[in-house]
Amino acid sequence: TPFIDSLSRHSLVFENAYSNGLRSIDAIPAIIAGLPTLMDDPFITSSYSTNNTKGLVEILNEQNYHTAFFHGGNKGTMNFDGFASYAGFNEYYGRDEYDNNKDYDGHWGIYDEPFLQYFAKKLNSFTQPFFAFEFTLSSHYPYHLPAHHQDKFPEGPLKIHRVVRYTDYSLKKFFET
């Protein structure tokens, strides 16, 4: 991940840390609401996801921030849109709002590169101050790449390595936008 590695040179990095969950879905309530992963099933898909919490988004809303959650998947997928609403996000942007089926990966939602470009365009339209959260999809099983990138990223020892390289590339394009 050459681009992500390059960002670490300009970041506060903790080398001795642990993940707050086993799956990517566990990161969302940890980051947004400070909720640790304490259950076998993800908090977002549990009956507890509608509990009252006062997390980062609600605090930013009180400070007159515009808040938006981005996820290139279908509404209802993993209850991301529901959790975004309960967490207090002003807006949710997913596959329906993106509205370009040619960039659909056939499984999770919109490929990272085009959805991150959409994300950048929307960010540029927001008035300040704002807070936006983006959940990327392409680095998830079954690890599909867009047809025009099939030969661009080399295989690695694990199938996920190609799509992680693609996500790294997509993030670089986002930062260049």
Predicted regions and their residues:
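Solvent-exposed soluble domains appended to multi-pass membrane proteins
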Residues: 1-177
